[in-house]
Amino acid sequence: MEQTATTKQLLEQYYSGFARKEGWETVLSDDFLFTGGDMTRPEPLVGKAAYRQVIDRFSRVFDAMRVKEMIVDGENACVIGTYDFTFPNGARITGDVAEIWKARDGKLQALTIFFDTLTFQKNTPA
């Protein structure tokens, strides 16, 4: 039961910082694994720095986010996050993202996300 609370606490801290666009990376492991956003690349990005680069780009188009649902089972969790986006072309969209998490040794270790990549491709310049 202790690990479930710890995983939930890590996620709550992550999402609190993520919504403010600051401080979220403190709960990530240095060898963090991120998979998502590009269906042609199934292998994960490795490292906190690599994930931070992805989020720096993503942060330009999301205005707000909130956790819609969180299910935690030991070191594993699934979060449905609702994001409000404003794209460079002016399009405004609210959408849900499925986020599958793995925690290890008191840090968030891995994240795999699922979302509507076509909407992003249509609304962001190449």
Predicted regions mapped to residue ranges:
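Short, acidic, Ser/Thr-enriched surface-loop or helix-capping motifs
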Residues: 29, 87, 103-105
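Short beta-strand edge/turn micro-motifs at domain boundaries
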Residues: 99-122
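Short acidic-aromatic low-complexity motifs
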Residues: 2-30, 126
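Hydrophobic/aromatic beta-strand elements that line small-molecule binding cavities or substrate pockets
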Residues: 51, 65-71, 82-85, 96-102
